[in-house]
């Protein structure tokens, strides 16, 4: 199942059903990433990695051995629209273009994704750019940009709640398997379970 990519295929089938039911709002996409611990314990210095697809990165002052889960969440419904799994060292910015669905009215993301060319590309496609503005060397952010950042941050909180739910209730704080292929399939299945439960909630509210 994992080798054949059936997890992603099943997720796509559910996405079609959610669209047919009119549950996906497309008001905006909330894009973010979170760190997930690898299944085996981290290797000691000089030891070979117990998981060849996991990697080290730093979170604040602490080291982290594992993976990074990237999500695209539908603003308004809270449904997961896309998911990706990479090593922890992979920059979330590198995956941004692949996380944009293309049919959303807006995209909201934190400052890690901020690039002028990226913002222009979104606007050229008619997509509102809600990427948080970052100060650059010799170019501090303006007061207007600070106000926008506060609004973008409020909108983005919804994706952080999704991550919190996935880690608290679906065990996404640690991988269950060794290797990216099996873990990627497992996380697609978790995304399916999350969306099925969310679907029942949304249908009950209509």
Q: What spans do the regions from the language model cover?
A:
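Short amphipathic alpha-helical "recognition" segments used for binding
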Residues: 72, 96, 164, 171, ...
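C-terminal domain-tail junction helix/linker
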Residues: 181-197, 201-206
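Charged alpha-helix within mobile-element recombinases
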Residues: 10-20, 165-166, 188-191, 195
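Helix-centered, glycine/charged polyanion-binding patches within enzymatic domains
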Residues: 101, 105-106, 111-188
